[in-house]
């Protein structure tokens, strides 16, 4: 079982290790050499706004193993607007499980927790071609493929 909570400053080193692994594997991609620092800055901004009670459209969820109380994964969701500027859906921008915890159903539990925590929101996720595990996880959790770019990036949408 997992506990889902909002991330805080002390989670950033754990998350950045997973981001580094994701960049290495090709699951995450950022332009330029400063991509890693850009992600860190973005995460720090989100946790600072949480700490200061500033409303934002981003959700940084951290998932802890219940018995050990240690983080095993995270997800960053971002609110997206339509052309009129209205909130239209949430995008799962980043999603990762610690390498030593993969293959144990943790990703499935994390995704289920996200779905349950965001009722009434349209959820979407995009995957780069190397993200085969994530594509399978999404497809097996009620997400349907809605778009594939020429570069192979696939976008999925949750369907009840």
Report the location of each language-model feature.
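Conserved N-terminal glycine/acidic-rich loop preference
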Residues: 89-93, 132-146
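Hydrophobic pocket/interface hotspot
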Residues: 15
């Amino acid at each position: 079982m997992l506990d889902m909570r909002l991330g805080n400053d002390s989670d950033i080193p754990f998350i950045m290790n997973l981001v580094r692994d994701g960049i290495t594997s090709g699951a995450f991609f950022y332009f330029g050499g400063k991509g890693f620092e850009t992600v860190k800055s973005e995460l720090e901004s989100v946790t600072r706004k949480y700490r200061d009670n500033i409303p934002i459209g981003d959700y940084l969820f951290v998932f802890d193993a219940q018995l050990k109380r240690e983080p095993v994964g995270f997800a960053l969701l971002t609110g997206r607007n339509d052309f009129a500027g209205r909130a239209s859906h949430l995008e799962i921008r980043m999603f990762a499980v610690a390498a030593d915890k993969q293959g144990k159903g943790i990703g499935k539990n994390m995704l289920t927790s996200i779905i349950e925590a965001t009722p009434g929101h349209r959820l979407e996720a995009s995957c780069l071609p190397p993200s085969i595990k994530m594509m399978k996880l999404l497809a097996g959790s009620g997400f349907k493929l809605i778009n594939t770019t020429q570069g192979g990036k696939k976008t999925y949408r949750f369907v009840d």
